[in-house]
Amino acid sequence: MSTLLETLDQQWVNSRLYVDKDERRTQLGKCVEEVHDFKIQLKKLKAHLLKHGSSPQKRLVIREKLAKSHKNWDSSMKKSLNSSISTYRKFSKACVKPLNEFQLDSVYVNKINPQKLYYLDTAIFSHIARYYTNMAVGTTSDEMLKYLHSTYRIPRSIAMDYIEMANIVKEMRSGNLNTCIRWCQDNNLEVLHFQLHYLNAMSLLSENKPMECYLYIQTNLASTVSKSSQLRMARPVSALLAKIVIGDTIPASKVDAYLETCVECFTKQYCLQNKLPLHSALFLVVLSGVIGFQVFTKYEAIRKVSHVDWSTADELPFHVKLPPFLSNYHPIFICPVLKEETTKENPPYSLPCHHVLSKKSLDKLSKNGTCNFKCPYCPVMSTKVKTKRVSFMKLP
Amino acid sequence: MTSLNEPNVDFHLKLNQQQFNIPSELLKRNWDKFNNLYTSYSVELQGQFATLNTLLEDPNKDEQSIEKLNDIINTVNILQKRLSQLHDNELTILERIEKRVEYFKQFERFKYDSNTDKLLKWYRSYTDLLIADYLVRHGSNSIDHKNKIASNSGIEFIKTRGLEDLIDYEVLIEANQISMELIENKNLRPLLEWIENNSAHLTEKGSHLQFQALLQEYIELVRCSDYKAAIRCFQTHLAHFANIYPKELKLAAGILAFFKSCLNNGRDDEVTNEQKLFHAYFRKQMYRPHPLSSISSSNVVHNAELCRYGPLLDHERWESLNKMFLHEFYSLYKISYHDPLLIYISLGISSLKTKDCGHTISAQLIPHENPEVNEYIKSNVVNTDCPVCNHDIFPLSENLPFAHHIQSSLFENPVMLPNGNIYDSEKLISLSRKLNKMGYTKLKENQVMDPIDKSIYATTDFIKMYPT
């Protein structure tokens, strides 16, 4: 359970930062109200003064009242001001300070070469082009490309890859799925094709047009559903039909959510079809950074206490466990003897028993090829001549 | 723990300390403004009330006292308007805090539901925030003179993405503007203004920034030969620092007399001058001994005594002034000095980078007689989506360490072909079937083709491997 977030949320944002959370009233707000009340009081006293100013006795009373209300006002202002700043101080101490347990700068030990930062700009361009070309201002592709160039300096060559996708997404969001449906037909994407028609049917029903929805299902979805292999698709359609029969509708929010799912599916398919990376590289690197951060800060904390230094210069001193989709890009072979990753300089070799070792450990075991040795994993004897250089190749 | 192995919610909050550090500081600053405003008006009102009091004592001054009371009401009215503006500021800041808490609550929900798709989408917005931060910090600014609001590509990005509540871009762009003025236009005005507004914080920290900025102002006056103004600047601003920076001030005073000779007599033999220069440095190590840059380096220094003025005239002072300013600025709001995006990228690359990254397999490919096969293999088989191998990211990984692995991560059913390449046997067979199906190759039922060197082997040649 997250304690920090809960304190922030329950204790502060929802109560202590305010005098009254529901009205969003703060101590400073109270001050402003007090100024207002004071003004009203002064106005009232002015009216009195205008009316009864001639009588010396009344004048005296008004004078006293003025002095009193000024004094009261001043002291209550001071009180509210004080409690306002003390609230902030407490907030800062109780909520904000615990967040500063470590400094982001402290883990930035291995710095990126500042001379290479212009590559980062291109990576950012690709990121924006991949995800947000459809948000570019403009009605034609040309206008959108121009906008991306003038705002972010994204070159045409990068944005060009995504402009068709962006246009289709734009159309989808404006409620027109036809181009996307055609695109699916051209690329033989049955599932997405079905999803789009289903989305159309959903929006018809949500607009309270059950008859049109029914006819739409009949012409566009029935043939796919009737194929025996597509039972999976039959279920949502039958749910839709049932809704028509009992006279139920679909809330617009559900349709919107489903639209977003379709957009997501479409962009994925578009990237696959056009051999574009599914995610921007920058996003994947940052994601790995977030996941790795916890280990880096832990290491940094230990390093500080025990005065160990960042040990191996070219390898991290710890393992970062990344999810499978971030760690399966390259085959990694760790030599079982040296416990080191094999490289171009220290490649893997296969023994006659088909166990694999790295070249360095082979040299050590065979004393540079001068003697026979036993495989560290089985009783088979081997010589260096009998080994064979191998390479691991990952297939998609 | 979900499949991403992502950190917990509190850790995310700590990573985003600046999302709360800044508003917390802003709340206090806003309060200061509120309080100062009130105090100054309160003093004024005190006076007005005192006059009113005496006026009321005199029954003949009826009209005047009404007038005075009107004045008071007016003052209070203005006070109310100005205070409610500050109060609106406060509410905006509080709303931001609330939105941010909501943002992390969203993350908490997705994590709790183990909803990987939603989590990835959330992390995408997280990445966008980092990108926005980077762009706002470094973008070149355009100023809308009508509203006096500065903007740049980062702010544009924030607005299109609807991230306004999650990043304090006004603060970041203020730093960017002052820093750009220093570096690009050699303009000290905005910096000096900022220093004046934040002098309390700077003195508390014992910062050198104010002195260095004023010194620079003086040097620039000398550089453009406005000696009168330079002397005035020295007397009014620099003289207070005589006890703290006596050496620097001596040099600064000297420069007034020697500036011309520093510039004029420079040209005779460069080499010996440089040697003298170094000698002088070692004798008087007051500043960083870096070679003098640009204009000054070629013509400063005729004799070793004069060259000690070199560093003062050096244009690199602007750089160091800028660095000093950014350090002070970011520490004021407790923002990290380095760009968070770069920090994440550095850690991310190191967590991902394998020894294989950057060595493209396509270089090892031996072409097949059928170009279609080559094309297919190039784009479908050896093409990797590895983010570190990406042509934009790989150059950034240059000086960064590799990931540390404790276990091999290979594939199922490794088999070795006679040429030494080891593949996943099932995938190799299915690849060969696919190539046949598409009509690219005519392999027999029990044959496979090595996609790298295109040699054909029988499945009976497979040697089962036991990598550990």
From Swiss-Prot, chain B:
InterPro entries xref list: CTLH/CRA, CTLH_C, Fyv10_fam, ZF_RING_GID
UniProt-annotated location(s): Cytoplasm; Nucleus
Alphabetical UniProt keywords: Cytoplasm, Metal-binding, Nucleus, Zinc, Zinc-finger
GO biological process: negative regulation of gluconeogenesis; proteasome-mediated ubiquitin-dependent protein catabolic process
Main location: cytoplasm
Keyword Methyltransferase on entry: no
Protein family (similarity comment): Belongs to the FYV10 family.
Protein's UniProt name: Protein FYV10
Molecular-function GO term, any one: ubiquitin protein ligase activity
Job of this protein: Involved in the proteasome-dependent degradation of fructose-1,6-bisphosphatase.
Gene Ontology annotations for the cellular component aspect, listed alphabetically: cytoplasm; GID complex; nucleus
Keyword Translocase found: no
Residue ranges constituting the CTLH domain according to the UniProt record: 171-229
Classification via PANTHER family: E3 UBIQUITIN-PROTEIN TRANSFERASE MAEA, MACROPHAGE ERYTHROBLAST ATTACHER-RELATED
ZnF RING-Gid-type span: 386-453
Alphabetical list of PROSITE patterns matching this protein: CTLH (PS50897), ZF_RING_GID (PS51867)
